[in-house]
């Protein structure tokens, strides 16, 4: 199975903003608000964006560079890309532009960044259906990525962005809130692997396996996701101050 790179790109950008903002909100409200609707009121989302406005772009670029590069280059070539950028004296923004591979992909990334940023500034978290209708589509039908790699990169963005959002208000190690992480991952897989948003309203919320299989469709995609979640969690423990 292949996924168009522009769809992957849009998923990565949306997932970053959803996860980063959720991390900030979780670190602010703790367990005082127990549902996503209560935790993501328009007023709360707007205030979060205003309080952390200057931090969003640097964290975005740091979080997104590797997934963007891995989407457009072979893993073996990424080190060369970084080395050449350092020799040119590129700043992080230029490095991210290089990671996009083409001007069209970079422009698509900027458009998605502005769209998601603007939605949050207005206090809105876009629904899966709205995202799938509005995301930036490129003209290159041949620009595709294996679904397995797309899932792996999406998992990485969700978990790193969420952890880095949690750390914005933290003084020590942070703990991932499972309910938030699973909600973020479910939404991310929904928009990545489907052309129309899959409703999970009729699914048993206590049966996570069934919920994820409904949006992932196959055991292979579900296993790819869970394996990458385990690997990324270990990396977060080592590098990002996440409690084990």
Walk through the language-model features, giving the residues of each.
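Extended non-catalytic scaffold regions that mediate assembly and binding
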Residues: 1-54, 59-61, 65-157, 162-244
